[in-house]
Every structure is written in structure tokens, then in C-alpha cells.
A protein has these predicted regions:
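Beta-strand secondary-structure signal
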Residues: 5-7, 18, 79-83, 118-122
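A short, compositionally biased
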Residues: 2, 76, 129-131
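Beta-strand elements of well-folded, non-transmembrane domains
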Residues: 23-25, 84-88, 123-127
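A sensor for short, sequence-defined functional sites
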Residues: 92-149
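Short acidic, gly/pro-rich beta-turn/loop elements at beta-sheet edges
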Residues: 16, 29, 90-92, 131
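Pre-Walker A-like glycine/lysine-rich segment at the N-terminus of P-loop NTPase domains
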Residues: 1-51, 55-70
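Conserved P-loop NTP-binding catalytic core
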Residues: 40-113
Length: 149
């Protein structure tokens, strides 16, 4: 299983970007072109998975601001979607069933029916708490969040 796609919306200098990854992907660009932002987006998605539930905390400087939205408290939510997909049938049927099978955390794609897992991270400003609140959700095949996964 490898990371095959990352979608970034309203995060730092990136308004809307979808990157597809191969088995080897290199980020090349001029200074201030977004390479570090892409790496920070990956880190934000993966942080909760590897830290026993503690997540990277977003702050007001992480929101994409432009001429239409100069106030982080009024900015569009940050949205990150990370896609993992098997390169070929790597998982035994027992593991697929433990993860809910098709319709659970896993969805099967393509003629080969390789397993795919999608994780969505949303960060938005809360006027109630005065802080940035972050949600982590696995998505089903229809892009709907899965409850309690």
C-alpha cells in the first residue's frame, strides 16, 4: 500500500491542489512555490495515525488567505484528503474484512479491485472556542465520512 494522491484545499499558500504520487515522487520547484506546504500537509494527515490520537494542531497562519478572505477566523476550512491504495492485491481477505471490507474503511477500485483507503482532515475556526478545531475521518467509496472509525 502506498500514498497515491493528496488533495490540499485552503492550506497556507495553496488554494486547491491535487497531487498524484508514483512509487517514487520528487518535489521540485522554486523557493516559495509550496513544496514545504505539501510536506506539512502530509505530516498533518499522518500525525494522528502515528501518535496514538494526538494530532498536529493547526493555527490561524495555516489558513489560505487572499484578497477575498484576509481574516483567518472567516477563511474557508482547511481540507486535506490523503489516499492510500494497494499496488496489487497485497492484503489477505481476513484483513480486508477486519477493516470493514468494501463499504467500511476500505473501498475497492479498478478492474483488479485493489483496496483503497481515504483519510480526510478538516480544520476550521470555531467562534465558540476561539480555536481551530480539527476533524479526522475515513471516507467511504462515496466520499462520505465513516462514523467512529
Amino acid at each position: 500500500m502506498q500514498i497515491t494522491e493528496l488533495t490540499i484545499r485552503n492550506f497556507r499558500g495553496i488554494k486547491d491542489l491535487t497531487l498524484e504520487f508514483d512509487s517514487t515522487t520528487v518535489l521540485i520547484g522554486e523557493n516559495n512555490s509550496g513544496k514545504t506546504t505539501v510536506l506539512h500537509a502530509l505530516r498533518a494527515c499522518l500525525s494522528k495515525l502515528r501518535s496514538n490520537g494526538r494530532a498536529v494542531v493547526f493555527d490561524e497562519y495555516d489558513f489560505h488567505l487572499d484578497e477575498n478572505s484576509k481574516d483567518p477566523t472567516q477563511a474557508e476550512p482547511i481540507e486535506l484528503i490523503l489516499t492510500f491504495q494497494e499496488t496489487d492485491k497485497e492484503w489477505p481477505a481476513e484483513i480486508e474484512q477486519q477493516l470493514g471490507g468494501d463499504g467500511g474503511i476500505i473501498s475497492f477500485v479498478g478492474a483488479e479491485e485493489t483496496a483503497r483507503i481515504r483519510l480526510k482532515v478538516i480544520a476550521k475556526y470555531s467562534a465558540v472556542t476561539g480555536d481551530v478545531e480539527t476533524e479526522f475521518n475515513f471516507l467511504d467509496a462515496n466520499e462520505n465520512p465513516l462514523a467512529n472509525k
